């Protein structure tokens, strides 16, 4: 059995974790950037939307997964926005990744629909944001939802993702934290 491919952005993931510990903030990078890169590649994504930039780890992972995709990523913390922009520019990908500063609910209505992949990793999933993401995804587009094990509103989102009416969904980890859903 061969070893998994190295994570080209592990340094940024580790820096994000260190930043969170130092500052006590909510910068949590998704633990498996290579999985996100592979999913975006499998979906042949051209447009990707991310909610929850932190320091740019997952946006960079998506860009690595599909070499000609453009990524819109949203972050409300101005310090995280600045650090993400620095990391993205240092990787030479600032021409493909746009970091939008603001609340999800304020930025999402300004974006054009037709995304191939959307990724929610910005805290506890809430139904209103998932409804907005559904409106921005094309039919057949892929929604990746993290943090489904946080209870509260996440339970409502999980129920909607698995009702079989609007999405075809599967969990991607044994803890039930992340779902991959295709918009029907």
Where is each model-derived feature located?
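A short alpha-helical cap/connector motif
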Residues: 1-117, 124-144, 148-184
